[in-house]
Amino acid sequence: MRISKPHLRITSIQCYVCLLLNTHFLTEAGIRVFILGCISAGIPKTEANWEDVRKDLQKIENLIQSLHMDATLYTESDVHPRCKVTAMNCFLLELEVISHESRDGDIEETVKNLILLANSSLSSNGNITESGCKVCEELEEKNITEFLESFKHIVQMFINPP
Protein backbone atom coordinates (compact mmCIF):
# COMPACT_ATOMS: atom_id res chain seq x y z
CA MET A 1 0.00 0.00 0.00
CA ARG A 2 1.27 3.45 -0.90
CA ILE A 3 0.68 6.51 1.25
CA SER A 4 -0.01 9.46 -0.98
CA LYS A 5 1.16 12.10 1.49
CA PRO A 6 4.82 13.15 1.04
CA HIS A 7 5.39 14.34 4.62
CA LEU A 8 4.82 10.78 5.88
CA ARG A 9 7.92 9.41 4.15
CA ILE A 10 10.49 8.27 6.67
CA THR A 11 13.94 9.79 6.33
CA SER A 12 16.98 7.69 7.02
CA ILE A 13 18.72 9.28 9.98
CA GLN A 14 21.49 6.69 9.83
CA CYS A 15 22.95 8.44 6.76
CA TYR A 16 23.08 11.73 8.63
CA VAL A 17 24.69 10.14 11.67
CA CYS A 18 27.34 8.45 9.52
CA LEU A 19 28.05 11.70 7.69
CA LEU A 20 28.34 13.63 10.95
CA LEU A 21 30.57 11.02 12.56
CA ASN A 22 32.95 11.06 9.61
CA THR A 23 33.17 14.83 9.12
CA HIS A 24 31.84 17.56 11.37
CA PHE A 25 30.92 15.68 14.52
CA LEU A 26 34.20 16.54 16.16
CA THR A 27 33.45 20.27 16.12
CA GLU A 28 31.12 22.16 18.42
CA ALA A 29 28.88 23.15 15.50
CA GLY A 30 28.65 19.52 14.39
CA ILE A 31 27.54 18.44 17.84
CA ARG A 32 24.81 21.12 17.86
CA VAL A 33 23.55 20.05 14.43
CA PHE A 34 23.47 16.44 15.57
CA ILE A 35 21.52 17.25 18.76
CA LEU A 36 19.02 19.49 16.95
CA GLY A 37 18.55 16.82 14.29
CA CYS A 38 17.80 14.20 16.93
CA ILE A 39 15.31 16.48 18.66
CA SER A 40 13.50 17.39 15.43
CA ALA A 41 13.29 13.74 14.38
CA GLY A 42 11.33 12.99 17.56
CA ILE A 43 8.73 15.73 17.18
CA PRO A 44 5.40 14.25 16.03
CA LYS A 45 3.75 15.70 12.93
CA THR A 46 0.16 14.70 13.67
CA GLU A 47 -1.35 18.07 12.82
CA ALA A 48 -0.56 17.60 9.15
CA ASN A 49 -2.00 14.07 9.27
CA TRP A 50 -5.38 15.32 10.48
CA GLU A 51 -5.47 17.97 7.75
CA ASP A 52 -4.87 15.22 5.20
CA VAL A 53 -7.58 13.09 6.84
CA ARG A 54 -9.95 16.04 6.46
CA LYS A 55 -9.04 16.40 2.77
CA ASP A 56 -9.53 12.68 2.12
CA LEU A 57 -12.88 12.85 3.92
CA GLN A 58 -13.96 15.68 1.62
CA LYS A 59 -12.86 13.61 -1.38
CA ILE A 60 -14.91 10.64 -0.16
CA GLU A 61 -17.92 12.91 0.33
CA ASN A 62 -17.63 14.16 -3.26
CA LEU A 63 -17.23 10.64 -4.65
CA ILE A 64 -20.21 9.30 -2.70
CA GLN A 65 -22.53 12.03 -4.01
CA SER A 66 -22.20 10.55 -7.49
CA LEU A 67 -23.03 7.02 -6.26
CA HIS A 68 -26.23 7.82 -4.31
CA MET A 69 -25.58 5.32 -1.51
CA ASP A 70 -28.36 4.87 1.04
CA ALA A 71 -26.55 2.98 3.81
CA THR A 72 -27.06 3.81 7.47
CA LEU A 73 -24.02 3.92 9.71
CA TYR A 74 -23.36 4.07 13.45
CA THR A 75 -22.76 7.76 14.07
CA GLU A 76 -21.61 9.66 17.16
CA SER A 77 -23.27 13.04 16.70
CA ASP A 78 -22.34 14.59 20.05
CA VAL A 79 -18.73 13.61 20.80
CA HIS A 80 -17.45 14.48 24.25
CA PRO A 81 -13.77 15.56 24.13
CA ARG A 82 -12.77 12.79 26.56
CA CYS A 83 -14.27 10.17 24.18
CA LYS A 84 -12.86 11.44 20.90
CA VAL A 85 -10.41 8.54 20.36
CA THR A 86 -13.14 5.94 20.96
CA ALA A 87 -15.49 7.83 18.64
CA MET A 88 -12.80 8.11 15.97
CA ASN A 89 -12.22 4.35 16.08
CA CYS A 90 -15.96 3.82 15.52
CA PHE A 91 -15.94 6.22 12.58
CA LEU A 92 -12.99 4.38 11.04
CA LEU A 93 -14.77 1.03 11.38
CA GLU A 94 -17.89 2.43 9.72
CA LEU A 95 -15.77 3.96 6.97
CA GLU A 96 -14.77 0.42 5.99
CA VAL A 97 -18.49 -0.31 5.49
CA ILE A 98 -18.67 2.58 3.03
CA SER A 99 -15.63 1.23 1.21
CA HIS A 100 -17.11 -2.26 0.98
CA GLU A 101 -20.61 -1.19 -0.07
CA SER A 102 -19.48 1.36 -2.64
CA ARG A 103 -17.50 -1.14 -4.75
CA ASP A 104 -15.72 1.90 -6.19
CA GLY A 105 -11.94 1.80 -6.65
CA ASP A 106 -11.42 5.52 -5.95
CA ILE A 107 -13.44 5.37 -2.73
CA GLU A 108 -11.69 2.18 -1.61
CA GLU A 109 -8.23 3.70 -2.17
CA THR A 110 -9.14 6.98 -0.45
CA VAL A 111 -10.70 5.14 2.51
CA LYS A 112 -7.58 2.96 2.93
CA ASN A 113 -5.37 6.05 2.85
CA LEU A 114 -7.60 7.93 5.32
CA ILE A 115 -7.64 4.99 7.75
CA LEU A 116 -3.86 4.67 7.53
CA LEU A 117 -3.35 8.39 8.18
CA ALA A 118 -5.84 8.49 11.06
CA ASN A 119 -4.38 5.38 12.70
CA SER A 120 -0.86 6.77 12.47
CA SER A 121 -2.07 9.97 14.13
CA LEU A 122 -3.99 8.07 16.79
CA SER A 123 -0.94 5.95 17.59
CA SER A 124 0.95 9.13 18.48
CA ASN A 125 -1.55 9.56 21.33
CA GLY A 126 -0.39 6.25 22.81
CA ASN A 127 -2.76 3.64 24.14
CA ILE A 128 -5.40 5.91 25.59
CA THR A 129 -8.19 4.17 27.46
CA GLU A 130 -11.35 6.21 27.67
CA SER A 131 -13.95 5.08 30.18
CA GLY A 132 -17.64 5.88 30.09
CA CYS A 133 -17.78 6.14 26.28
CA LYS A 134 -20.36 4.43 24.10
CA VAL A 135 -19.32 1.41 22.06
CA CYS A 136 -19.99 1.64 18.33
CA GLU A 137 -23.12 -0.53 18.37
CA GLU A 138 -24.76 1.77 20.95
CA LEU A 139 -24.58 4.74 18.59
CA GLU A 140 -27.52 5.94 16.55
CA GLU A 141 -27.68 4.85 12.92
CA LYS A 142 -27.73 7.77 10.49
CA ASN A 143 -27.47 8.25 6.74
CA ILE A 144 -24.13 8.79 4.99
CA THR A 145 -24.49 12.57 4.77
CA GLU A 146 -25.01 12.93 8.54
CA PHE A 147 -22.24 10.38 9.19
CA LEU A 148 -19.73 12.37 7.12
CA GLU A 149 -20.72 15.67 8.78
CA SER A 150 -20.17 14.15 12.23
CA PHE A 151 -16.91 12.62 11.03
CA LYS A 152 -15.68 16.03 9.85
CA HIS A 153 -16.60 17.49 13.24
CA ILE A 154 -14.53 14.94 15.17
CA VAL A 155 -11.55 15.36 12.81
CA GLN A 156 -11.78 19.09 13.53
CA MET A 157 -11.62 18.23 17.26
CA PHE A 158 -8.26 16.55 16.64
CA ILE A 159 -7.00 19.49 14.55
CA ASN A 160 -8.10 22.10 17.12
CA PRO A 161 -8.25 20.39 20.54
CA PRO A 162 -10.56 22.05 23.08
Curated annotation (Swiss-Prot):
Q: Which UniProt keywords apply?
A: Cytokine, Disulfide bond, Glycoprotein, Secreted, Signal
* InterPro entries assigned: 4_helix_cytokine-like_core (IPR009079), IL-15 (IPR020439), IL-15/IL-21_fam (IPR003443), IL-15_mml (IPR020466)
Q: Choose one Gene Ontology CC annotation of this protein and give it.
A: extracellular space
The yes or no answer to whether the keyword Glycoprotein is present is: yes
Please, which domain of life does this record's source organism belong to?
A: Eukaryota
Compartments annotated for it: namely: Secreted
Q: Which residues are glycosylated?
A: N119, N127, N143
Q: Which cysteines are joined by disulfide bonds?
A: C83-C133, C90-C136
Which residues are the propeptide, according to the record? 30-48
User: Which GO BP terms sit in this record?
Assistant: immune response; interleukin-15-mediated signaling pathway; neutrophil activation; positive regulation of cytokine production; positive regulation of immune response; positive regulation of peptidyl-tyrosine phosphorylation; positive regulation of phagocytosis; positive regulation of T cell proliferation
Instruction: Give any GO molecular function from the UniProt entry.
Output: cytokine activity
Task: Kindly indicate where the leader peptide sits in this chain.
Answer: 1-29
Quote any Pfam family the record assigns.
IL15
Query: Which family, according to UniProt?
Result: Belongs to the IL-15/IL-21 family.
Protein name (database record) = Interleukin-15
User: Source gene?
Assistant: IL15
